[in-house]
Amino acid sequence: MNSYGISEIAVIALRKSPDERSEMVSQILFGETFEILETIDRWCYIKLTFDLYEGWIDSKSITPLSENQYNEINAGTQAFTKRLFSELIKNGKENVIVPFGSTIPTYNNDGQLFKIHQNSYTFNKNSFIENLDPKDLLLQW
């Protein structure tokens, strides 16, 4: 059975080997989804959904998703942050700062609320742009 996850952390280091001192080959931004391919101790070898990069991340940084949740998130409308840093409010009380290009999964332009797993997030709609490839977003910047 396949395992899936999503990042609820602003930036996660994607490493070449399962070690904190290992070279960082890429970064996972808030809202990015991935498939978990292998687990060794506290490390998971993952493949990113968007760009298919592969590497190791600390298992503590993973919010697990069921296959249905994973498919629903990736089939739905997504928005991306368009400011250098944008603020989200987690569960009505915790500020979360996310960088440019972060994904807002299951974006609903009727409101300013989305959920990841059991957490609810609110945001300022002016901080995001919907239905745009992140590569095109860079060109607008």
Label every model-predicted segment.
Residues 1-3, 9, 19, 26, ...:
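Boundary regions of SH3-family modules and the immediately adjacent low-complexity/disordered segments
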